[in-house]
Amino acid sequence: MSEPGSPCFLTHFAVLRDPRQATKVLYPLDEILLLMLCATIAGADDFVEIGLWGSEHQDFLRRFLPYERSIPSHDTLCDVIAAIDPELFKSCFLAWVDGLRTDVPEVIAIDGKTSRRSHDRRKGRLPLHTVSAWATGQRLVLGQETVAEKSNEITAIPLLLRRLELRGALVTIDAMGTQKEIAQTIIEGGGDYVLSLKENWPATYAEVEKVFADPPAALKLQRCQTVDGDHGRIETRRHTMCHKVDWLFSDRRYPGEFQFPGLAAIGMIESETERGGGVATERRYYLCSKKLDVDTFARVVRSHWGIENGLHWVLDVVFHDDLARLRSGHGPANMAIVKHTAMNLLSQAKPITSLKNRRKRAGWNQDYLEKIIQRTA
């Protein structure tokens, strides 16, 4: 599919099957993928903009591939992307990311996001909801799984986890993903978990809340405190870690076994936020399969929220994901992969400026764009 001198990411997508009839193909699939990625990196947000960008940058694109029939129309781009097998596309993305990262992520944050304007009321189609895996330290999207209609994140998260290399990583998930089956999937994959515990597990939550409210001295809790402040807000976080968990009741069906496989520690964070003369307090509890020291626990939980600012916010503000109106076929799911690919490449680019400015620079400077897409993997 790819040619000598073409961007190396294309080699990882070479196994993609072209959904079109071979006798009717005017624009090769690798040319379409290269156009989609380059234009998205350079600032194009929809198929019309991608087509316009391609028409104005044909000489640049021909540095890598022939483009003998010029640039496809935006309708052709839309039809092809909507028809590509999303499962195979995801597998290609995962293979590419595995080559891109240089080490095992310490923390992998799992969280979901809805593309708000991808719904189609006329056809009764709900907005696209995608669960993504984010390497908090490397700031890389590791993978994604589309949540099926009439389903939820609980069914999508295990599918995503089984696609990932989890050995040696800590997986963090909010309360929606605090499920026994998900914990088991992480353990079986060689990883460890830090799962948020809320009232959706009422008996477990009540027991943990009761013990942490008046902990026995025998528990030998570890504690640390952090203070942050900005824009008139001061937040004090008191972290507590308990490595002794045999006081937590077991699964009644299997006496002596914890409800959550591999449970080794329980943590609590009490946050106190001062703003405008008022004070708000909140307590959050976490189930952990690894006996983290309290400072590591504090850092891991804090890093989980990097997926909100580092991924979801960037997709909405830099890539205008919430404004995208793509609705047909597999288009929304496949475009999410294109944006994640563009975002990963931009995240690795230098100099270190905002992704918004890196994206603008790629649109203005073809040599800079070439360096980005030629990132070896």
Where are these regions (language model features)?
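Conserved, well-structured functional cores that handle cations and Mg-NTP chemistry
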Residues: 8, 15, 22-173, 178-181
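Charged, often Cys/His-bearing segments associated with DNA-binding zinc-finger transcription factors
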Residues: 1-23, 73, 84-87, 91, ...
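Generic secondary-structure signature for well-ordered alpha-helical cores
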Residues: 86, 98, 162, 191, ...
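Structural motif
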Residues: 22-32, 276-278, 326-334
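A short, flexible helix-boundary coil/loop motif
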Residues: 16, 57, 314-377
